[in-house]
Structures are given as structure tokens and as C-alpha cells.
């Protein structure tokens, strides 16, 4: 899943194979892997992680929704969105838009709460939404903006993806 913008300068911390690729920014939240532990958390990320991607938007913290974020003008726009979170058992949950599934930030956060997310962060939305999920029984993928559309609009391929096996 794409977790940052279409350029080589990611916004926030990115760690790949234990090597920091970009620096932290204040605020937001993290999806990270440390050892065999996968976690989603607002506000902080351990220094020694194997993989990490920071977002500037958090949606749910300890079961409390980010009402301030939901009141922002950009949050009310209907577009493709996603939230990545964990439930009280520590299971990781991805909620993502698909073709025609344009929603507000409030919509995607509230769906996260309905699905049991207690810690959740929102990664880049709109034309940046791109994902592929595959296991032994099921596969689905989605790209908000085709490769041709990216070229025409001057976007490149995203450089930061979340990959979970």
C-alpha cells in the first residue's frame, strides 16, 4: 500500500531494512515493524525499527477519534482514503477505498471504529491511494491514478509502500 506522496522526499520518518531514509516530523502517527512485531501508533515510534512509515494524520488514539482533524476543510472532501490501525488484540486492520468509494475522513475513521480499530493512522489519500492485498485465498488491488495518468499529471510512482507478509 502506498504510504506517502509521489516524490522521493517522503513526509515524515521512513525506515527500510533498519536504515532511516527520511526524517521524523512532529505529530502524526506511525506504522512500523520492530523484530517480529507490527504496530500502529500515534505520536511515537521506537528508534530501532526495521521498517517504518510516518503519516502526519492520526485518526484514532486509544479509542478516541480525532475530532479536530474531522473539522478541517480538506477532511470533508469526498475522495479515496485509507486508515491503517490495530484492534485491542493487536491485529492490524486496513480499511481502504475502492473504485467509486470516495469518502470523507470522518467516514473512514468511523468505519475504523466500527471495525474495532483502537489505534489508527491515515496515509496519503486521493490520487495517491494505491494498494494490493493478497493471501492464499483472496487478492484485490486498486490504483486511484493509472500509470498513464501519473505521467500526464507529472506524478511519478510512489516511493514508499507498506508491505506486510
Q: What is each stretch, according to the model?
A:
Residues 1-165:
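Gly/Ser/Thr/Pro-rich low-complexity, intrinsically disordered segments
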Amino acid at each position: 500500500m502506498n504510504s506517502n506522496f509521489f516524490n522521493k522526499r517522503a513526509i515524515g520518518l521512513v525506515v527500510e531494512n533498519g536504515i532511516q531514509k527520511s526524517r521524523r516530523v512532529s505529530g502524526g502517527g506511525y506504522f512500523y515493524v520492530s523484530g517480529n512485531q507490527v504496530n500502529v501508533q500515534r505520536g511515537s515510534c521506537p528508534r530501532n525499527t526495521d521498517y517504518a512509515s510516518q503519516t502526519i494524520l492520526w485518526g484514532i488514539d486509544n479509542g478516541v477519534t480525532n475530532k479536530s482533524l474531522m473539522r478541517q476543510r480538506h477532511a470533508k472532501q469526498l475522495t479515496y482514503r485509507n486508515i491503517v490501525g490495530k484492534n485491542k488484540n493487536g491485529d492490524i486492520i486496513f480499511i481502504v477505498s475502492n473504485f467509486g468509494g470516495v469518502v470523507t475522513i470522518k467516514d473512514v475513521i468511523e468505519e475504523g471504529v466500527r471495525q474495532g480499530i483502537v489505534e489508527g493512522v491515515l496515509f496519503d489519500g486521493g490520487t495517491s491511494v494505491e494498494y494490493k492485498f493478497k493471501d492464499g485465498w483472496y487478492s484485490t488491488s486498486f490504483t486511484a491514478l493509472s500509470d498513464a495518468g501519473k505521467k500526464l499529471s507529472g506524478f511519478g510512482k510512489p516511493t514508499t509502500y507498506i508491505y506486510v507478509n
